[in-house]
Amino acid sequence: MKPLLLSLALAALLVPPQAEARRIGQLEFADCDLAQPGTGATSRFECATLEVPESPDKPDGRKLVLKVGLAAARSSEPAADMVLFIAGGPGQSATETFPSAAGGFARLREKRHVVFIDQRGTGEGHRLACDFPEVMTDVAASDEQQVEMARDCLASFDADVAQYTTSVAVKDIEALRQALGAPALNVYGGSYGTRVAQEYARQYPDGVRSLLLDGVVPPGLALGSEHSINLEAALKAILGRCADEPACREAFGDPYRTLYALRDRARSQPATVPVPDPRSFATRELRLDESAVAVIARLFAYSPETAALLPLLLDEAN
């Protein structure tokens, strides 16, 4: 065989075979790489699309194409009752959120498929989001400015925003279940996703085999109404542990009092501080005021890893 022909033959053997599409019910899944926003990381899953009417009352009207993700079971004969992952926010895309949460579903995937679908308004092609000027993200906007920005954002949409509520979004979940030909689902919801899960169970009780709610948002609670109260309780507990531990107190004093001292200083003397952008590494100037201190404390209190850093960071900031 001539060298060129031999090389071509070897190259053909080295090309991995094209994965066969997986068909579940009416949906055909193919391999896809899902990106994690803000990082360069991608994860390999399987994806399909589901077309639904924007308005359930107008089935022949405008259509939305929702992205569906599948973390396939490892078993060659998976159980019929799948796990449904519902993202939080509100506003998170499930196909952007699941990759970072996938590790927590590893054991479930031994025998069951895990499916997830972008809630209407959160995914590519139907995302209800506005590009605010970067200066407004760096400097705290006044209440009046935020209201004006919200009105301008709303006016820019060509969508019927009344059709992007929780009570309408769960109809897409039921459409997904029926398209998959699945029996009742094992539904997982986190944060705002717990409200979606509860609403789905309310409207479609026969579609739910089990319900797992992580960080429950009761249906009757106005979103955001208890954030400050819960944050205060969390910070007292987190920072109080340091104050009660002799070695931590010796190193960092009373972090809770330090936090409020920083808050008071930022309130009376807000400062502009240079920080490296984590994505571009370019230096940006951010306004450090009372609101910024509260936001930083809240976000660091979200997970044990970052919460453990609060006494050190507060001490250094002070």
Predicted features and spans:
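P-loop NTPase catalytic cores that bind/hydrolyze ATP
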Residues: 286-314
